[in-house]
Amino acid sequence: MNIVFWGETHRSGTTANYTAMAGILPHLCPDRKIVCGSLQRERCEDSALFLWDAGVCSPAGQKKLLLTADLVVVNFEPQDYDGMEQFFLRHMYLEKRMVYLYANCIGTPEPDVLNRVYRVDEGQIGIVRYNAA
């Protein structure tokens, strides 16, 4: 299982949140061996450049780490970037059918494909809603 932590390295609490996530991931995926990959980029105002830097729109032949992930922990608010929210909802949530997490999000996170919603705040992590239906 390839897990990508993707976000802004200068955000307060980022390292603490990543550590917290590493502790809870075995509980989210108890039957799988967890292989963690990581990708961190500083903020870019141009979302196209941000996606290119993230390896999503990289030149042919380069590994697209974000698109090969089974789980992505996002450490920024997608609505802050032009087109970023639709990118995650359409390409990651709908097409990839991957678990969908936010870290340090403002507002209510979207549920993942199992209707689970996770919330990571500075110093703590928890499942804020679970709907088994």
Where are these regions (language model features)?
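Beta-strand-loop-alpha "switch" segments that mediate conformational coupling across diverse proteins
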Residues: 104-105, 111-133
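Conserved C-terminal guanine-recognition region of P-loop GTPase G domains, centered on the G4
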Residues: 83-97, 101-104, 114
